[in-house]
Swiss-Prot record:
The lineage of its organism: Bacteria, Pseudomonadati, Pseudomonadota, Gammaproteobacteria, Enterobacterales. Belongs to the UPF0208 family. The chain crosses the membrane at residues 46-66, 69-89. One of its GO terms (cellular component) is plasma membrane. Its main location: membrane. This is UPF0208 membrane protein PC1_2779. It comes from the Bacteria. It is a multi-pass membrane protein. It is found in: Cell inner membrane. It holds the Pfam family DUF412. Keywords: Cell inner membrane, Cell membrane, Membrane, Transmembrane, Transmembrane helix.
Amino acid sequence: MATKPDSRISWLQLLQRGQHYMKTWPAEKQLAPVFPENRVARATRFGIRIMPPLAVFTLTWQIALGGQLGPAIATALFACSLPLQGLWWLGRRSVTPLPPTLAQWFHEIRHKLLESGQALAPLEEAPTYQSLADVLKRAFSQLDKTFLDDL
């Protein structure tokens, strides 16, 4: 990440921001070569859906076969922590300020949206990846795909 995000955010807020960022980021294949968000969000969604049942299966399998409970609990906790790691990464990414080149691209897309008559909230500080996700989502739904030519 380019610069350090604000460290005053609690873990729970970071996970909530990660979930919001995952829902906001446009899952467009044109963005995949440049941004890792598509891959991380897809893996996190998969983990949220698959890992809790896998943890329960691991626990019941170990208990049913008379195995040791310690390793079974450790494996289940590890399986449940994987989606949390993805949400944590997405949350940290969402509050990270954009590097200068991406900030310039962000302002160009925002300017194109404003020129097309879209109402946007004013920027109160340096743009973050969350504000980029908001603008990209709006641009994909309102503009033609030529705004991606500068990427």
